[in-house]
């Protein structure tokens, strides 16, 4: 360790700490002043909380500590109340205004430290304000931004920024849970609850207003009452003359006077009328300032009118006839000057547009970019940042948490979704009637199903009315579609045939000419097309029923510019549409799927023609805007909208009297009818970087035949029927469930806020889906993107020992005994066995091993590199900067793997087995042997047949008993003789007991003595007094009772005593030990600890004997000698009590160390059990006089107790062997003996064992997460793959892909702005 390094850190920190904090506090006040409008309501609540704290000082230290903790955490508005109802984000700044303090902090960061929390300035703003700040003031710098890091320590700063957002979410979850629990416990009214109710009421009102105007089908929004042209945006220039006269204060004007430009007034009146239907979004606050200025002018002029009218006396001076005209002309000129100073424009939308109630609104963001006057909050925030000299995007990244915000919130997905929805609604996406000629188009005609209000549950947060974004509104439809049933009936095959593949996004590349394609094919660089063609060939010969896509469906960022001309759904239609075949079709139909030179050239000619037509239409349309009348353009726009969904709803939109469940055509078919086989899909982590909602949206748009992705997690149930013609129509039936999960969400991947809050809803759904499938299905398969384990390069990123994700998945997999788990992510093909789990990894549809490499994972280069794996995994890490030495060790669980071929897996599922083969995409031939796994339905029997499952377990248990008894006959004989001897002695003891209560308690002990299972069920109804007496008798005659029974009774008695203490404490303030203490003067119990052994030994010494000799002499004493001894002891204590103490002393000396320890543990039970019954009167509590007890019977009992066990003498070896038995072996010994000795007791044990098995197999799943309790299930750290992605972002001096995504988002927003500009009304 370098001591000088720590010295450099510590000494300056001490010297500069006070001035640094002082400077920070001063500037923090300045920054708050700059954004005082934002904090106005916050400061008011803080002052109210201070008053409340002064009034509640008497409530206790615990409450004061809790509220002070909440107060110290930050602003009450954003931390104390439930954050999920607020629309604000936490924007943190880590930079001091003082130059010396800043240099000192930079030195600490360079030495490896992080920016301290005392340097943090927190501002709570809306997310759209952050984006406006970025795209308005830092966009030019962002587009030229080449790298982020000036030092390797800044890389740690980048990681820390994201981790802070993750931890903030964890802390919010925890604190809100504590806050709810305290409120529920205290049952106190809280102002925050009123605030929450107010916010929810407002959101409910907005949502109800939305439902009155709009309906959703999961893909688009449809207006009920208005046509599309009603919602066309209005373009308002900032410098446009827009003055409207004040008619109320206008003086009477002589009609002879020349009026003010009538046409201008009419136009402005029309604009005023339209302004009633349109509204400016939140960020256009310049209009408010304009109104204030105009209002002030009107007020002053009104006063002038009144003064002039009071002085005038109905004069008709010609100079004053046009006075009002001159005045209004002057005001109009002044208004022009104000307008001329404002450059830019804004777009106004109707206040009932489907995005008007969204906090993050892309139209508002466009207005912030195009308008000269920006949001006041953004302007003041930027002013504060400039004072801190944060003027470049590099500074913004290094000294704020803006990257953490991008990782935490779904900015990309929401804005891309809004852009697409707006473009599709207004028909701004050009389409051809025949988009792709190669792919057979879907012939089925189905209805559009639209949805109304969605009923939110406690676990759901990203649905209305809590959330009003476009994503949340669409998700309210998606959440209703999570379970689907399909039926397959065959007569030529007894199996369901399906294929799986993963990581298809890496294969989406720019198309080339036919000759170039042939050249790439020669070197193997046509991976995805090869996989697609091989799958279609397999489908043609085996008639596949469906395909499973395992995630990572989007291309690299450098391909996005090219792919935006095609749209994602068109490429999916080309490559992954598999025509549905009938069983009667011939198997040689594979030729219909082959791609020839002619149809490839024809396809690209169509694409090129389409792109050219699009560019031409855009130019013509842009040129026609200024010359074409608005009405004609609007009609033309509607006529050119060729969207399938919009055409289907055209009749519905125009005629508002019809129901909104409108069919596309009068003749319809069932929704379940497909011309293409289903193509089921899920998300990978790369999909969350770009636009994940588009993939779900395309399911409802139905533009990709067979494409199936209704929600980010869902379940598919297949009912299969095989009609065997050879066996006269005998049917073979089975049911298979495929559960598709979002593994990235379970890992709390980015966007962190969305996935963290939706974690528990998916967790509970998985538990429910698995439970239902275990009851109903013969097969259960789980489908997810990330592997449980693998031997690939990323294996240590997802090691099952590290992540909470794998703990959760492992618990589900083992508990429900699933039949298989399909995954991808690692670019290889592999089959693994992890205990009883069957794991399939298939992520090599387009790359091998190195997914990001341009050469090493592609073509025959990848085949060569992968063939010598894992040697290359180590060697190439020193050559290629993108590689990491991860997963280089071969997994010991791998049964088969292929790391050098691209391909997919083919499966045939029958009633009893699943047969799997991995197929090489280039050759179309299997590269693995047939992998056969058997059905595990019998292991899931406890879920669908609990009684049958229990009976099977009992049969297995009885077989073990039989095996044990057959192997140990002498052991069984010994135990039976011990039972007989003990029962004989116990019967004698019971007959000599004093009272009926003791006899009843002793009978109960004899009944429970040889019970091994379910003892608690037999003593649940026993009273406390009887339990206490049973415990006393069991300890007194402990040599004849089962040790477990004595221990169990002692524990139950302790629990009963604790309950009694709680009850008495609540009623009266008694001492907690009062129930155990008795009056020593009333009675001295035998075995009382106050009777010390030393006193007994002194007494024996006075007699001149040793303890052993004393017992022998006592047996030989006459009655007179015993009476004399009793007189010497005194009448208060019986002689038998002293004798028992002596015997106990001798017995302890003979015990081993372990036996002595066990004996001492039961001393406390003896003390508790010997407590006299206080409910009886004092005269009944004392024992009967000694002279009234039959002395002969007492002597017999003592003889029985002290007599050595004859059976133990005869079987010494077996006694020692019994002590070494395990718990299970001892139970087998007891039951084997009871089966012969006492069949009734044996049957009772078997029945109790059944109940134990049922309780252990109770089919209620693992556990359910309570409200706001997710932090108990998730990891405290980011998942390793998030860290890997962030580490890849943190390379010094390189262009980072993440910032290309931000630039691409800005370009998309500007593209939408240009498209809106074509249809906007001036």
Curated annotation (Swiss-Prot):
Record's compositionally biased regions (Low complexity): 631-646
Ranges where the record places region Disordered: 267-326, 613-646, 1066-1087, 1170-1196
Keywords for this protein: Hydrolase, Manganese, Metal-binding, Signal
Protein name: Serine/threonine-protein phosphatase UIS2
Interaction with phosphorylated eIF2alpha, as annotated region: 1-535
Top-level taxon in the UniProt lineage: Eukaryota
PANTHER family reported in the protein's UniProt record: TARTRATE-RESISTANT ACID PHOSPHATASE TYPE 5 (PTHR10161:SF14)
Record field: compositional bias (Basic and acidic residues): 267-279, 288-326
Cofactor: Mn(2+)
């Amino acid at each position: 360790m370098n001591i000088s390094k720590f010295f450099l850190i510590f000494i300056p920190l001490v010297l500069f700490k006070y001035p640094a904090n002082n400077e920070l506090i001063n500037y923090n006040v300045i920054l708050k002043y700059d954004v005082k409008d934002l904090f106005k309501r916050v400061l008011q609540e803080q002052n109210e909380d201070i008053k409340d704290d002064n009034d509640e000082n008497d409530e206790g230290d615990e409450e004061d500590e809790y509220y002070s903790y909440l107060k110290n955490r930050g602003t009450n508005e954003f931390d104390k109340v439930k954050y999920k109802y607020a629309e604000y984000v936490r924007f943190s700044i880590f930079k001091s205004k003082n130059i010396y303090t800043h240099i000192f902090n930079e030195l600490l960061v360079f030495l490896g430290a992080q920016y301290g929390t005392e340097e943090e300035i927190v501002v709570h703003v809306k997310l759209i304000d952050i984006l406006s700040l970025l795209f308005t003031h830092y966009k030019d710098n962002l587009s030229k931004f080449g790298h982020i890091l000036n030092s390797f320590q800044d890389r740690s700063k980048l990681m820390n920024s994201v981790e802070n957002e993750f931890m903030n979410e964890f802390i919010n979850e925890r604190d809100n849970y504590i806050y709810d629990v305290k409120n529920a416990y205290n049952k106190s009214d809280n102002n925050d609850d009123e605030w929450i109710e107010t916010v929810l009421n407002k959101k409910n009102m907005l949502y109800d207003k939305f439902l009155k105007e709009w309906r959703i089908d999961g893909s688009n929004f449809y207006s009920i009452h208005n046509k599309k042209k009603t919602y066309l945006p209005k373009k308002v220039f900032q410098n446009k003359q827009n003055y409207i006269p004040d008619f109320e204060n206008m003086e009477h004007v002589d009609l002879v006077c020349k009026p003010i430009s009538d046409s201008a007034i009419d136009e402005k009146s029309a604009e005023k009328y339209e302004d009633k239907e349109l509204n400016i979004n939140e960020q256009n606050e310049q209009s408010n300032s304009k109104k204030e200025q105009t209002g002030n002018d009107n007020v002053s002029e009104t006063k002038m009118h009144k003064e002039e009218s009071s002085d005038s006396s109905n004069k008709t001076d010609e100079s004053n006839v046009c006075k009002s005209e001159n005045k209004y002309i002057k005001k109009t000129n002044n208004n022009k000057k104000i307008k001329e100073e404002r450059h830019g424009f804004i777009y106004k939308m109707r206040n009932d547009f489907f995005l008007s109630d969204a906090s993050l609104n892309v139209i508002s963001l466009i207005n912030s970019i195009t308008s000269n006057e920006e949001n006041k909050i953004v302007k003041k925030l930027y002013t504060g940042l400039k004072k801190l000299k944060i003027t470049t995007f590099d500074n913004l990244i290094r000294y704020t948490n803006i990257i953490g915000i991008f990782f935490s919130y779904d900015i990309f997905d929401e804005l891309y979704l809004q852009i697409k929805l707006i473009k599709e609604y207004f028909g701004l996406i050009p389409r051809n009637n025949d988009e792709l000629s190669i792919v057979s188009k879907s012939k089925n005609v189905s209805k559009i199903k639209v949805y109304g209000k969605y009923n939110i549950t406690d676990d759901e947060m990203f649905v209305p009315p809590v959330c009003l974004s476009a994503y949340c509104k669409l998700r309210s439809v998606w959440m209703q579609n999570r379970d689907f049933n399909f039926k397959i009936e065959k007569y030529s095959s007894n199996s369901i045939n399906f294929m799986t593949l993963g990581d298809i996004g890496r294969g989406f590349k720019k198309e080339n000419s036919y000759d170039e394609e042939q050249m790439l094919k020669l070197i193997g660089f046509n991976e995805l097309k090869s996989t697609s063609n091989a799958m279609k060939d397999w489908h043609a010969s085996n008639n596949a029923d469906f395909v499973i896509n395992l995630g990572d469906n989007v291309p690299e960022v450098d391909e996005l510019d090219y792919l935006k001309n095609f749209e994602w759904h068109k490429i999916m239609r080309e490559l992954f549409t598999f025509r549905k075949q009938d069983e009667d079709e011939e198997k040689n139909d594979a030729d219909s799927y082959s791609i020839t030179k002619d149809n490839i050239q024809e396809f690209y000619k169509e694409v090129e023609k389409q792109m050219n037509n699009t560019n031409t239409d855009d130019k013509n349309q842009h040129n026609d805007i200024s010359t074409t009348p608005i009405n004609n353009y609007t009609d033309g726009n509607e006529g050119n909208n060729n969207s399938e969904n919009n055409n289907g709803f055209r009749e519905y939109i125009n005629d508002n009297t019809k129901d909104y469940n409108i069919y596309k055509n009068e003749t319809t078919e069932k929704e379940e009818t497909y011309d293409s086989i289903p193509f089921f899909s899920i998300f990978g982590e790369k999909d969350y970087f770009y636009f994940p909602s588009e993939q779900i949206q395309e399911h409802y748009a139905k533009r990709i035949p067979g494409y199936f992705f209704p929600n980010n997690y869902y379940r598919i149930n297949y009912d299969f029927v095989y009609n065997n013609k050879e066996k006269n129509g005998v049917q073979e039936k089975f049911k298979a469930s495929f559960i598709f999960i979002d593994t990235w969400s379970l890992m709390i991947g980015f966007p962190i806020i969305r996935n963290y809050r939706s974690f528990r809803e998916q967790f509970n759904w998985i538990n429910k889906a698995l439970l239902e499938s275990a009851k109903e299905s013969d097969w259960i398969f789980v489908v997810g993107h990330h592997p449980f384990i693998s031997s690939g390069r990323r294996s240590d990123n997802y090691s099952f020992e590290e992540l909470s994700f794998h703990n959760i998945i492992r618990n589900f997999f083992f508990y429900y005994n699933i039949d298989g788990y399909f995954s991808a992510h690692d670019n290889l093909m592999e089959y693994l066995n992890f205990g009883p789990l069957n794991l399939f990894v298939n992520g090599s549809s387009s790359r091998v091993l190195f997914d990001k490499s341009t050469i090493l994972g592609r073509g025959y280069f990848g085949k060569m590199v992968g063939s010598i794996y894992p040697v290359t995994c180590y060697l190439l890490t020193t050559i290629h900067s993108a590689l990491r030495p991860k997963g280089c060790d071969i997994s010991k669980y791998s049964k088969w793997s292929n790391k050098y071929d691209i391909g997919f897996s083919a499966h045939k599922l029958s009633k009893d087995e699943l047969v799997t083969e991995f197929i090489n995409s280039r050759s179309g031939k299997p590269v693995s042997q047939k992998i056969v796994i058997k059905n595990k339905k019998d292991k899931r029997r406890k879920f669908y047949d609990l009684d049958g499952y229990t009976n099977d377990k009992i049969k297995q248990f009885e077989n073990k008993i039989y095996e044990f008894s057959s192997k140990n006959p002498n052991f069984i004989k010994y135990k039976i003789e011990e039972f007989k001897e003990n029962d004989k002695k116990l019967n004698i003891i019971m007959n000599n007991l004093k009272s009926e209560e003791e006899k009843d308690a002793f009978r109960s002990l004899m009944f429970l003595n040889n019970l091994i299972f379910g003892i608690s069920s037999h003593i649940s109804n026993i009273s406390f007094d009887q339990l206490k007496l049973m415990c006393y008798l069991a300890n007194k005659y402990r040599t004849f009772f089962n040790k477990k029974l004595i221990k169990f009774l002692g524990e139950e008695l302790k629990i009963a005593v604790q309950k009694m203490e709680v009850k008495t404490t609540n009623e009266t303030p008694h001492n907690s030990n009062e129930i155990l203490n008795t009056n020593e003067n009333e009675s001295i119990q035998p075995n009382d600890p106050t009777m010390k052994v030393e006193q007994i030994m002194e007494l024996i010494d006075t007699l001149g004997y040793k303890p052993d000799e004393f017992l022998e002499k006592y047996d030989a004493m006459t009655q007179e000698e015993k009476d004399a001894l009793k007189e010497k002891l005194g009448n208060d204590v019986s002689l038998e009590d002293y004798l028992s103490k002596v015997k106990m002393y001798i017995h302890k000396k003979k015990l081993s160390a372990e036996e002595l320890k066990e004996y001492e543990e039961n001393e406390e039970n003896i003390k508790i059990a010997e407590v006299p019954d206080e409910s009886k009167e004092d005269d009944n509590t004392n024992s009967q006089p000694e002279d009234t007890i039959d002395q002969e019977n007492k002597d017999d009992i003592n003889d029985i107790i002290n007599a050595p066990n004859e059976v133990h003498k005869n079987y010494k070896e077996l006694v020692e062997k019994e002590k070494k038995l395990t718990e299970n072996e001892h139970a087998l010994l007891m039951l084997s003996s009871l089966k012969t000795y006492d069949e009734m007791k044996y049957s009772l044990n078997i029945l109790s064992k059944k109940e134990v098995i049922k309780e252990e197999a109770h089919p209620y799943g693992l556990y359910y997460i309570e409200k706001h309790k997710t932090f108990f299930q998730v990891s405290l750290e980011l998942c390793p793959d998030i860290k890997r992605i962030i580490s890849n972002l943190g390379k010094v001096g390189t262009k980072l892909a993440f910032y290309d995504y931000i630039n691409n988002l800005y370009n998309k927003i500007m593209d939408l702005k240009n498209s809106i500009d074509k249809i906007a009304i001036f």
